[in-house]
């Protein structure tokens, strides 16, 4: 835990203590400042609400504000404060007189109880109510999990009652999900126990944030688009290898009903009472890593500046933000911010985790090429970029200056940010520079590859241009499957790479800015409803496991019933 503002007088507060002490405004007042009438806010208590679909539809002809992406370098396991910086930047923009909204993802229970913690920011740059957001919030993840598992149940039920669609039980592509890290459920055998329980088959669970239903909710433009996409989900194949869709077993309507309310964005506020949309939550290492299109496009109609994040490093989240979300939603980003920390750069320079707090300018300079590659990669999309140095108390002036000097050699600028400890006052400089950059009109956004490029070449484009790999390794089965999907009319879809977040390569231990490595493809999955091809590389898992000492061991209720240990 880093020391907080006020440490000189011995005042040390945890994230949850800071959040609990926040002076929140009634959510109706937050909405009123955005021009949302109370009848179009569906309240969940006094501090959170959903925005009605009717209000959202009425905003479509309005002019868009500026769109700013916050991404990061390859992180340490604890993360580098990307959400914290996203929230802090919006507070900073509002502090300097700009009308800004933050758009971030909802938290998954997996990392909350695992190693990474929640997704509400930290220190004095948080969205609140932090406890609700990090736990059950408005029930969106429950709805997504329920809709996904309804389809799973309907598949087995369809087979049990005669299998009218002639589904080949060896080729069922749809698994089950739960919002928890549980390695024991990765591969299981279901329907054991006799004839009454159905046909035994191998299956498994993924984490909810890897669900195609999550991706669909985050990419759908409205409820009708949502239902259409749900119907397009491929649940498996027949013996002649023709696909079976969710609509073929009449699952799409009921799934859409379960997701009707979840489709509406959630409005909350920052510690400084600025508006925040928190909606959707796909991971960026095993999914596309962006908040919902509906939340982002709505925010763009209501504010002059919208700041959103994309998960993990720019090799994952930012690439998918540009190549999937912006491509599919017609978004045009105006600027990007790459969050870097001294500790993450030193880790990329070879410093061990236990030594990250010690000054080591030489190792930092050795790790800077990791930051440099992320800067160059973002610029490949035609988007101008700034670097935010998220300050830790262990950082030294020499280390901070070394980062600034390095970034300057690449034609960009790095700005020291202390929003974690000081709130908006600690990020004013970055806010000024980001607003100027976004307003300058320098962005010439273009995706990395065209729609018409063959699928395998799209994979190679990402691997070679973004990861700097020398080769993509895929066996005949993978290549043949990609060609079959092209023949079936799916060749125009973008690629969603599932890869470790800790390295440009598929080896989490290969730090820095490696070149000449290979990218082995283990599996490919067609997410026809979401509208992309998932390419699973290396040892990445779509159902994570818990660490040896999970965060859950520190989470409890105190004697008065208040939560302790959540971060």
Curated annotation (Swiss-Prot):
Alphabetized UniProt keyword annotations: ATP-binding, Ligase, Nucleotide-binding, One-carbon metabolism
GO biological process: tetrahydrofolate interconversion
SUPFAM superfamilies the record matches: P-loop containing nucleoside triphosphate hydrolases
S-S bridge residues: none
Pathway(s) this gene product operates in, as recorded in its UniProt entry: One-carbon metabolism; tetrahydrofolate interconversion
UniProt EC number: 6.3.4.3
Binding residues for ATP: 76-83
Family: Belongs to the formate--tetrahydrofolate ligase family.
Name by which UniProt lists this protein: Formate--tetrahydrofolate ligase
Reactions accelerated catalytically: (6S)-5,6,7,8-tetrahydrofolate + formate + ATP = (6R)-10-formyltetrahydrofolate + ADP + phosphate
Gene name tied to this protein: fhs
Example of a GO MF term: ATP binding
CDD domains: FTHFS
